[in-house]
Amino acid sequence: MTNPQFAGHPFGTTVTAETLRNTFAPLTQWEDKYRQLIMLGKQLPALPDELKAQAKEIAGCENRVWLGYTVAENGKMHFFGDSEGRIVRGLLAVLLTAVEGKTAAELQAQSPLALFDELGLRAQLSASRSQGLNALSEAIIAATKQV
């Protein structure tokens, strides 16, 4: 699709699944998890319009959401995205953490949403946000089948 250096983000590299587990583990109140999602979303760089044009706008989401990807020569996938909603940006950040730098086979072997369950995030999502998150997961799986 596009050169990944233009769609860099810290998720899956600097911010790892282990980082998120350690961050969310002490949070028992949904409001605290919500705040943490907003903070994660702030770390997600906004996509320039030219990358939004190359990325796929995901239907079924509460807010506008774009998801794109590239595949490195070693077969590892780099995903990037953006959203107009603060919470959705945070959810996208968690999703990018879960899928960044994995091969298509690795992504097909485990649900991209498994990390959300580990962090206790899916249970409190509204129906529309859950639907949007599922649409993002389906888009990732669809991307792995095109590799």
UniProtKB/Swiss-Prot annotation:
<protein>
    <recommendedName>
        <fullName>Sulfur acceptor protein CsdE</fullName>
    </recommendedName>
</protein>
<comment type="subunit">
    <text>Homodimer. Forms a heterodimer with CsdA. Interacts with CsdA and with TcdA/CsdL.</text>
</comment>
<dbReference type="GO" id="GO:0061504">
    <property type="term" value="P:cyclic threonylcarbamoyladenosine biosynthetic process"/>
</dbReference>
<feature type="active site" description="Cysteine persulfide intermediate">
    <location>
        <position position="61"/>
    </location>
</feature>
<dbReference type="Pfam" id="PF02657">
    <property type="entry name" value="SufE"/>
</dbReference>
<feature type="modified residue" description="Cysteine persulfide">
    <location>
        <position position="61"/>
    </location>
</feature>
<dbReference type="InterPro" id="IPR003808">
    <property type="entry name" value="Fe-S_metab-assoc_dom"/>
</dbReference>
<dbReference type="GO" id="GO:0097163">
    <property type="term" value="F:sulfur carrier activity"/>
</dbReference>
<comment type="similarity">
    <text>Belongs to the SufE family.</text>
</comment>
<comment type="function">
    <text>Stimulates the cysteine desulfurase activity of CsdA. Contains a cysteine residue (Cys-61) that acts to accept sulfur liberated via the desulfurase activity of CsdA. May be able to transfer sulfur to TcdA/CsdL. Seems to support the function of TcdA in the generation of cyclic threonylcarbamoyladenosine at position 37 (ct(6)A37) in tRNAs that read codons beginning with adenine. Does not appear to participate in Fe/S biogenesis.</text>
</comment>
<dbReference type="InterPro" id="IPR017763">
    <property type="entry name" value="Cysteine_desulfurase_CsdE"/>
</dbReference>
